[in-house]
Amino acid sequence: MTNEEKLIAEIDSAGLSAEMLESMPSPEMFPLIIVNLQGRIAELEARETEMLARVDTLIARLAHLGVA
């Protein structure tokens, strides 16, 4: 089995369609994609921190009211 045949078999076994393969970015785009993903992760982490602070504030308010 040639390398090309092995690759085709691997793609087939992974269930990747030709459309999916055609829509995949080129390897040259990977660094940009990684930077964009890192930025998005940082945004989500900041939102998570903000939400946790809000939860802490709500818990403190409830405790002050004698509910928590």
UniProtKB/Swiss-Prot annotation:
Keyword line: Coiled coil
Chain segments annotated as coiled-coil in the UniProt record: 34-63
Keyword Coiled coil: yes
Any further remark recorded for this protein: PRD1 virions are composed of a tail-less icosahedral capsid of diameter 63 nm, an inner protein-lipid membrane, and a dsDNA genome which is located inside the lipid vesicle. The DNA is packaged into a preformed procapsid. The internal membrane plays an active role in DNA delivery to the host cell by forming a tubular structure used for injecting the DNA into the host cytoplasm.
Role noted for this protein: Assembly protein.
The protein's name in its UniProt record: Protein P33
Highest classification ranks of the organism: Viruses, Varidnaviria, Bamfordvirae, Preplasmiviricota, Tectiliviricetes
Gene name linked to the record: XXXIII
